[in-house]
A protein has these predicted regions:
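C-terminal capping alpha-helices of c-type cytochrome domains
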Residues: 2-24, 93-112
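Generic detector of short, locally flexible boundary/turn motifs and exposed helical patches
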Residues: 3-7, 16-18, 29-34, 56-59, ...
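Electrostatic cytochrome c docking/interface patches
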Residues: 22-44
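Extracytoplasmic electron-transfer domains, predominantly the class I c-type cytochrome c fold
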Residues: 38, 42, 56, 60, ...
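Short cysteine clusters
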Residues: 49-52
């Protein structure tokens, strides 16, 4: 009888742990839906950045994944601003307005 109770308690404990793990990991990451972030997402979509870059592992493969761009050491908003404005050997330069650039950088910070 005690073996049945031991197995039953082990089953209940593992079931409780499984439910806890599922609930803790099923929360969606929160992206701040501020007006600036939404405007930056629109700029990102209008210029078809996803054709070359990935966000959360989805998108093109020509350019780098932008998911952690803003927190990567040696990168960040100043680096992104310079690369977007001047371009490089694989990326064209974009002449964005200051407002569009600020919104795009805010969007990239939100997906960081």
């Amino acid at each position: 009888m005690w073996k049945v109770l031991a197995w039953l308690s082990l089953f209940v404990a593992s079931l409780g742990y499984s439910v806890w793990v599922y609930c803790a990991s099923s929360r969606e990451p929160s992206i701040t839906d501020s007006e600036t972030v939404l405007a930056g997402k629109k700029v990102f979509q209008q210029h078809n950045c996803i054709a070359c870059h990935q966000v959360y592992g989805l998108g093109g493969y020509l350019g780098p994944d932008l998911t952690r761009l803003m927190s990567t050491p040696g990168k960040g908003s100043r680096w992104a601003n310079a690369v977007i404005r001047t371009g490089n050997e694989r990326m064209p330069a974009y002449d964005l307005t200051e407002a569009d650039m600020a919104a795009l950088l805010e969007f990239l910070s939100a997906v960081d």
